[in-house]
Amino acid sequence: MAEGDNRSTNLLAAETASLEEQLQGWGEVMLMADKVLRWERAWFPPAIMGVVSLVFLIIYYLDPSVLSGVSCFVMFLCLADYLVPILAPRIFGSNKWTTEQQQRFHEICSNLVKTRRRAVGWWKRLFTLKEEKPKMYFMTMIVSLAAVAWVGQQVHNLLLTYLIVTSLLLLPGLNQHGIILKYIGMAKREINKLLKQKEKKNE
């Protein structure tokens, strides 16, 4: 068991080191984005919502076709991939990195690797469910996809995408400041109260 844990830890460290090397040119930008997403300043949340709202208003105004939208998005990614590693050191000064910044960059890369592992793990579990319990897999997929299709039919595509993107960008800050845990705790307490009241009525 210990040998398996050590192997997993070593593999995680190797994957993290590899990702750090790949993203080295993006280090300064990632550190800045990390600060924004974790709401290190009070005005970061409204700034996130403002920028996202502006981007989606532009998309709504231009109303591009799917092909044009995808092409522009990929073109933007290509430009960013080319320009960011060149411009970031000149703007931020990568030679001025502190030990704390280097450690935070390592933590970000480690979290990205762990997130990727979780996603792969869930994907593998899905296929395991398909092999072991095909009926349950079939029913789960049909119900889930039908629910998603119904939501997509009720809500405008652009509005739904806006809500998803905004929620994902606000999620790290909500988690960092304990807001998610706070409301989960409140929901659990309310559920427990309802269950206790039901038990008293049954008695």
From Swiss-Prot:
Record bears the keyword Endoplasmic reticulum: yes
Entry GO MF terms: identical protein binding
This chain's protein is named ADP-ribosylation factor-like protein 6-interacting protein 1
- Alphabetic keyword roster: Apoptosis, Disease variant, Endoplasmic reticulum, Hereditary spastic paraplegia, Membrane, Neurodegeneration, Transmembrane, Transmembrane helix
Q: What is known of its domains?
A: The transmembrane domains are required for its ability to shape the endoplasmic reticulum membrane into tubules.
Phylogenetic classification of the source organism: Eukaryota, Metazoa, Chordata, Craniata, Vertebrata
The entry's localization annotation reads: Endomembrane system; Endoplasmic reticulum membrane; Endoplasmic reticulum
List cellular component terms (GO). cytosol; endoplasmic reticulum; endoplasmic reticulum membrane; endoplasmic reticulum tubular network; membrane; Sec61 translocon complex
Short name of one Pfam family: RHD_RETREG1-3
Which superkingdom?
A: Eukaryota
Lumenal side, ranges: 63-65, 176-203
Function as written in the Swiss-Prot or TrEMBL entry:
Positively regulates SLC1A1/EAAC1-mediated glutamate transport by increasing its affinity for glutamate in a PKC activity-dependent manner. Promotes the catalytic efficiency of SLC1A1/EAAC1 probably by reducing its interaction with ARL6IP5, a negative regulator of SLC1A1/EAAC1-mediated glutamate transport. Plays a role in the formation and stabilization of endoplasmic reticulum tubules. Negatively regulates apoptosis, possibly by modulating the activity of caspase-9 (CASP9). Inhibits cleavage of CASP9-dependent substrates and downstream markers of apoptosis but not CASP9 itself.
Q: Where are the transmembrane segments?
A: 42-62, 66-86, 134-175
Tissue specificity field: Expressed in all hematopoietic cell lineages, but the highest level of expression is found in early myeloid progenitor cells. Expressed in brain, bone marrow, thymus and lung. Expressed at low level in liver, kidney and spleen. Not detected in heart.
> Per the entry, what induces it?
Down-regulated by apoptotic stimuli.
Q: Which organism is it from?
A: Homo sapiens (Human)
Gene designation: ARL6IP1
Example GO biological process term?
negative regulation of apoptotic process
Membrane topology note: Multi-pass membrane protein
Which disease annotation does the entry carry? Spastic paraplegia 61, autosomal recessive: A complicated form of spastic paraplegia with polysensory and motor neuropathy. Spastic paraplegia is a neurodegenerative disorder characterized by a slow, gradual, progressive weakness and spasticity of the lower limbs. Rate of progression and the severity of symptoms are quite variable. Initial symptoms may include difficulty with balance, weakness and stiffness in the legs, muscle spasms, and dragging the toes when walking.
